[in-house]
């Protein structure tokens, strides 16, 4: 048998959704990419369980802390705002940025046999992540795929969910 779903009304705002609910309840979240009527996108992170609300709130808190740590390093932290609904629910709202991940750029260097380009990017990465390394906050997931290089060459940390005080 076949099944069909027909949606009527305005187009849904959510264009992508990922559930990260294979984690402990205190870290279970849903990440949505939304697009408004003008085509502007944003990323929203919601707690998937009541226990994960603090984890979502920490994304906002660590945006500020990482911004202080990496200020002047050339590594920008994707802006985050915290929203609350009338029922007290929380949501972290991040910019939707476009560009290429550092992972894609490094892979391309390897595919093209560009060892010099690879080394240059890797050393720049090391310089940026070591900046103020004694600062009492660390992102344990500061991987190549979480750094987006935009069309103007700016390095942006787009996901810093796994940041903790040291």
Q: Language-model segments: what does each one mean?
A:
Residues 62-72, 109-140, 145:
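Conserved kinase catalytic-core helix
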Residues 11-12, 48-51, 83-87, 97-102, ...:
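Short, solvent-exposed loop/turn segments at secondary-structure junctions
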Residues 77-122:
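Conserved structural core of kinase catalytic domains
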Residues 25-67:
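ATP-binding glycine-rich loop module of kinase domains
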């Amino acid at each position: 048998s076949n099944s069909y779903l027909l949606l009527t009304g305005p187009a849904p705002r959510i264009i992508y959704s990922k559930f990260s609910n294979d984690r402990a309840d205190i870290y279970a979240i849903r990440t949505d990419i939304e697009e408004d009527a003008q085509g502007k996108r944003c990323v929203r992170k919601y707690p998937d369980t009541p226990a994960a609300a603090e984890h979502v709130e920490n994304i906002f808190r660590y945006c500020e802390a990482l911004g202080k740590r990496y200020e002047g390093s050339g590594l920008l932290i994707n802006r985050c705002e915290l929203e609350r609904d009338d029922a007290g629910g929380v949501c972290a709202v991040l910019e939707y940025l476009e560009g290429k991940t550092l992972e894609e750029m490094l892979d391309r260097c390897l595919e093209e046999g560009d060892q010099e380009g690879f080394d240059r990017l890797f050393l720049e990465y090391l310089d940026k992540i070591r900046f103020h390394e004694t600062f009492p906050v660390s992102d344990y997931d500061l991987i190549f795929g979480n750094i987006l290089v935009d069309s103007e060459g700016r390095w942006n940390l787009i996901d810093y969910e796994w940041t903790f005080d040291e």
